[in-house]
C-alpha cells in the first residue's frame, strides 16, 4: 500500500472538483459529471500486490493485500453533502454503486465488497469534497463472517432466515426503527 504517500492538498484547490481550465489529458475528473468513479490513486489494496514484508511468525501471519479501491464522487459540488442530494441524484449514485459492486464481484480474488462514505477528520479523510470509496477485499472481514455463520446456524436450527426474523421483531416492538417503507427497513440494532 502506498497510502502514506497521499499528498497534502493546498486549501484553495480540490482534485475532485471539475476544472475546465485544467487541460491535462490525464486528469481524472471531467469538466462535467453527476457521479463519478475512478481507481484510487493511493489504494490500500492492489490487484497486483507486492510480496508482504517478511515479518510473519508462527503466530502472526501475513499475506498479499490483493483487492481493489475505487473513489466515488457524489457530486461536482465541493460543499454539498449526501443528505442534500436530490432523490434523482441519489438514484444515479446508487446505480453506480450497484454497477461497480457487480463488476468487482466478478473478480474471483475478491470475496467482499464494501461501499462506504468517506467523510470527516475522524476517519482520516484528506479531501473534504463529498465522496465515498468502494473496497474489494480478498477476504471476508471476521465480523461479517461471524454474522453469516450465526445466520446459517439460526437457519439450520429453526428453518427461518435470521434477518427476516430480526425485521419482524423490530416491526413488532417498533422501538428502534429509523425508517421503513414497502421496500426496506432501517433500524438501530438491539
Regions found by a protein language model. Name each.
Residues 1-129, 135-190:
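Active-site microenvironments that recognize anionic phosphate/pyrophosphate groups
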Amino acid at each position: 500500500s502506498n497510502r502514506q504517500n497521499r499528498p497534502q492538498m493546498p486549501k484553495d484547490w480540490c482534485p475532485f472538483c471539475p476544472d475546465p481550465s485544467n487541460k491535462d489529458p490525464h486528469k481524472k475528473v471531467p469538466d462535467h459529471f453527476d457521479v463519478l468513479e475512478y481507481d484510487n490513486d493511493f489504494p490500500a489494496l492492489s490487484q497486483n500486490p507486492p510480496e508482504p514484508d517478511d515479518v510473519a511468525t508462527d503466530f502472526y501471519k501475513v499475506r498479499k493485500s490483493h483487492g481493489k479501491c475505487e473513489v466515488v464522487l457524489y457530486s461536482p459540488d465541493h460543499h454539498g453533502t449526501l443528505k442534500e442530494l436530490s432523490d434523482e441524484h441519489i438514484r444515479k449514485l446508487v446505480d453506480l454503486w450497484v454497477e461497480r459492486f457487480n463488476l468487482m464481484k466478478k473478480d474471483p480474488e475478491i470475496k467482499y465488497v464494501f461501499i462506504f462514505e468517506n467523510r470527516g477528520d475522524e476517519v482520516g479523510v484528506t479531501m473534504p469534497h463529498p465522496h465515498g470509496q468502494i473496497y474489494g477485499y480478498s477476504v471476508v472481514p471476521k465480523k461479517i463472517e461471524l454474522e453469516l455463520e450465526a445466520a446459517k446456524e439460526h437457519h439450520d436450527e429453526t428453518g427461518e432466515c435470521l434477518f427476516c426474523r430480526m425485521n419482524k421483531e423490530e416491526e413488532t416492538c417498533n422501538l428502534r426503527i429509523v425508517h421503513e417503507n414497502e421496500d426496506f427497513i432501517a433500524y438501530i440494532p438491539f
